[in-house]
């Protein structure tokens, strides 16, 4: 997988190492994550709060990124274990995460006083798949930036159903460029999975989230 990423970077004249691989370990046991650690992996992505929390307790040296949809009632728990959150899609979630980090710090459940947060972008506005509509992205980014203990890190994008990845990632990259101008700094772009990472890297992805091609088919939940 890393060789495929490196080849794509070279093809599109991007520097080696400019894309990070985030293995997705949903449904995979802790033993599989330990194998990844042996190969130098320091961060993985998880979709479900309860599963991720249990794994984080067993593997305190691994960074766990929350990449699944978030319920506000789970924000306090996520704030205890998450090294980053890729799926913030409302001010309510952002503010709940900020409060959760403060509480976790007070209780000694967290060491880092800052939680990097990505906005999950909804290009088609379909609420059933999560994500923030284009019209609300800048407002939410400002909210994250203004929330104590949160750092606005960038955008996360999954192509909408029926969209080609080229179209989706091109539009998302344009949105990200506008945010970089707004904040006057570079931002991260969490985009691309096994089936569309070439298009994502072409359009500037800095983090690709890959599961099956690294660990094989997920065991049944």
From Swiss-Prot:
InterPro entries: Ala_racemase_N, PLP-binding_barrel, PyrdxlP_homeostasis. Keywords: Pyridoxal phosphate. One of its GO terms (molecular function) is pyridoxal phosphate binding. The keyword Flavoprotein does not apply. SUPFAM superfamilies: PLP-binding barrel. Signal peptide: none annotated. The modification N6-(pyridoxal phosphate)lysine is found at residue 26. PANTHER family: PROLINE SYNTHETASE CO-TRANSCRIBED BACTERIAL HOMOLOG PROTEIN, PYRIDOXAL PHOSPHATE HOMEOSTASIS PROTEIN. Belongs to the pyridoxal phosphate-binding protein YggS/PROSC family. Pyridoxal 5'-phosphate (PLP)-binding protein, which is involved in PLP homeostasis. This is Pyridoxal phosphate homeostasis protein. It comes from Corynebacterium glutamicum (strain ATCC 13032 / DSM 20300 / JCM 1318 / BCRC 11384 / CCUG 27702 / LMG 3730 / NBRC 12168 / NCIMB 10025 / NRRL B-2784 / 534).
């Amino acid at each position: 997988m890393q060789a495929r990423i490196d080849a794509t970077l070279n093809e599109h004249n991007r520097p080696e190492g400019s894309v990070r691989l985030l293995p997705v370990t949903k449904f995979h046991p802790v033993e599989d994550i330990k194998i990844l650690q042996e190969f130098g992996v320091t961060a993985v992505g998880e979709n479900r709060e309860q599963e991720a929390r249990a794994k984080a307790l067993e593997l305190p040296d691994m960074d766990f990124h929350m990449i699944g949809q978030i319920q506000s009632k789970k924000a306090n728990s996520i704030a205890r274990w998450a090294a980053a959150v890729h799926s913030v899609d409302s001010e309510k979630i952002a503010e709940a995460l900020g409060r959760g980090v403060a509480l976790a710090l007070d209780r000694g459940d967290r060491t880092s006083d800052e939680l990097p947060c990505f906005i999950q972008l909804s290009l088609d506005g379909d609420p059933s798949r999560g994500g923030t509509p284009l019209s609300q992205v800048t407002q939410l980014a400002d909210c994250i930036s203004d929330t104590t203990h949160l750092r606005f890190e960038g955008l996360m994008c999954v192509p909408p159903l029926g969209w080609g990845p080229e179209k989706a990632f091109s539009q998302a990259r344009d949105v990200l460029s506008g945010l970089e101008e707004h904040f006057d700094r570079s931002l991260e772009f969490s985009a691309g999975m096994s089936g569309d990472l070439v298009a994502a890297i072409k359009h500037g992805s800095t983090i690709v989230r890959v599961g099956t091609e690294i660990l094989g088919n997920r065991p049944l939940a």
